[in-house]
């Protein structure tokens, strides 16, 4: 029996819960494939065909069966109204991913609005306030 306390990192010092290299590679490839499909606007949904999207990040589960796609809409911050439309075309997008990638299972796609840019803009606006600038200059 080992006398060492349980550590918060896995083999080779990799933190538990951190994505593996394979997860990162597969997620980036999915992002690339989806970006191509969105750029070509190959949708039967008229609302999606006239909207420009940016896929900021894809996170994939350890078993590579579920992928969460973080997406934003260019020209507008409102992506929530289009999430049902994206859910409707998710099967088509999954098929497009399956055509390009060699995986045992094509991952099920889940779309989430990406709020990182909004958060960064909020922090920037806070830092530009006169009272904060005054405190930072001291």
Swiss-Prot record:
GO terms for cellular component: cytosol. It is found in: Cytoplasm. The keyword Cytoplasm applies. Keywords: Cytoplasm, Ribosome biogenesis. One of several proteins that assist in the late maturation steps of the functional core of the 30S ribosomal subunit. Associates with free 30S ribosomal subunits (but not with 30S subunits that are part of 70S ribosomes or polysomes). Required for efficient processing of 16S rRNA. May interact with the 5'-terminal helix region of 16S rRNA. Monomer. Binds 30S ribosomal subunits, but not 50S ribosomal subunits or 70S ribosomes. This is Ribosome-binding factor A. It comes from Granulibacter bethesdensis (strain ATCC BAA-1260 / CGDNIH1).
